[in-house]
Structures are given as C-alpha cells and as structure tokens.
Amino acid sequence: MEENFIEVEGLRVRYFEEGSGPAVLLLHGASLGSSADVWTGNLSDLAARGLRVIAYDQPGFGLSDNPEDLSVAYRTRFVLAFMDAVRLQKARLIGHSQSGRIAVRLALEHGERVPGVVVLATGSLLPPLPGRGKPDAAEGEEGAAAEPTLEDTRRLLEENVFDKSLITPAVLRTRLRMSTGKNFRAFLERSRARGGEKKESKRESKPLWQRLGEVQSPLRLIYGRQDRGHAAERAALAMRLHRGLDLHLVDRCKHLVQWDAAEEFAALSGSFLAEKT
C-alpha cells in the first residue's frame, strides 16, 4: 500500500493506493474522525481480487486540506476532479455512510464514468419505516460540540463497531488525530452549513432511496444487521419496494461494515466490481 499526495483544485489531497486492474475509489463517511484510514485494512483484500484500489481523504478530512466549500455537493463534484487528477476516466465507487449518497448521485448523473457502485451502511438510501419520520437528517455526521478527548473518540467508535476488540490503541490514536485541529474546525463548519443543504434537498422531487431503480450502473448495498436507525427493518422494506434490489445484511455488524465484516465486505464488493462491471 502506497501513501501519496496530489494537488486537486488547489487542495493538497492524501490518498492510499494498491493493486492493478479496474479502478475502485473508496469514499469514507462524514462523522468526526473519518478519513481514508478507515479503509487501510481492506485495500490488500480488494487488490488481491484484481482491482486497483484508491482511498483518499476527502476535502476537510484526514490529511487533506480544508476547502472553502464544505458542502456534500462540493465533495460530490470533487470525486470527478480527483478522478481527473489521477487520470481515471472511469472508476467504480464504494461509498460508506453519507458517501453512499455521493456514489449513487454520481452514478445517476455521470453513469458513463461510474461503471459500478457498492453502498455501505447508508441509511438515507433505505426507506423510512411507516410512522417513524425521517431518521437520517444528519447521516454520518456524528461528533462532539467540543474537541474530543481519547475517551470521547473511543465512545464514538464503540457506537459504530460491533467487535470492540477492533478498537486498538493504534486505531484510537489515529482516529483522535483525525478528529482534532483543522478537522474539528471543518466538522463544526459542516454542522453550521447543514441547514442550507436541508433546504436544497427539499427541492428535489424524490429522495434518493426512491430513485435506486433509475441507477443504470450495477449497484450493490451492504448493511450491518445491528446498525443504528432500524437498518435491518428498513433494508427488508427496501427489498419489498424495489424488486430485484441487490442488498445484503451482515450479522454481528454495526455501522463500520468494512471493519466488523472485513472478509464479507471484500468478498461481496471485490467479486461484484471485478466480475460484473
């Protein structure tokens, strides 16, 4: 696995890369402390399946620069800019949590550049349960009002991981590093900007979960059975509403699917993206 930096739209961006073959971009979520580091335990397994795997720190996360625009819309456009910078005309996308929305939107609007999508634990791509309202307003943006301590970071990870033994001292140190300083400032700015994004989303004629059938690229969704927001119940509802939807539930697995179910994730994603797209 190589760690590199590249300039994209005037921002210095860190990324990891491993393997050769069809290109796959791994897009991390938006909770405090998220970065490309959430994928480092998965790159080798995916690369071994004949894929060129790239995971980058999105703007405002990890070791990448903070942009002026911290909106989800900007980070969606930035995926294409990053692809251009690393000279990828096409790339399969794996989006975790909030970034599953990014991946699906790009497949809808730029399908010629996105020949396949895997969604991990994106609650907003599941229908709400009747009478429960909308549960994903701040999807994947969990954090803290004050810069977190090591114990704050541990608690946040424990909410998202079924197997607590995965939260090693090294993992905690990295997560805390990615949760403080310029990344915490970016988190606060994203929180303040969220109101404007809600107004914009209300203008859309249909939520993305109702548009999954419009995605022309091969699409697979993977959720942890023990994830928050009644994910298992809503996944079952999604499969009833969308006939033929390629959706998988993994047991003993919470929100960080790529950690709790690393082998299942690699098998389900690697074979799907290498063979069917």
Q: Which stretches of residues belong to each language-model region?
A:
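Conserved HGGG/HGGXW glycine-rich cap/lid loop of the alpha/beta-hydrolase fold
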Residues: 11-63
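Acidic catalytic loop of the alpha/beta-hydrolase fold
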Residues: 226-230
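Gly/Ala-rich beta-loop-alpha elbow adjacent to hydrolase catalytic centers
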Residues: 95, 99, 103
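Catalytic active-site module of serine/aspartate enzymes centered on a nucleophile-bearing elbow/loop
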Residues: 243-277
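Short beta-strand/loop motif that positions the catalytic acidic residue
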Residues: 215, 221-223
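Flexible "cap/lid" loop of the alpha/beta hydrolase fold
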Residues: 104, 108, 115-155
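Active-site loop/oxyanion-hole signature of alpha/beta-hydrolase fold enzymes
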Residues: 40, 48, 55-94, 109, ...
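Conserved alpha/beta-hydrolase catalytic His-Asp/Glu region
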Residues: 148-213
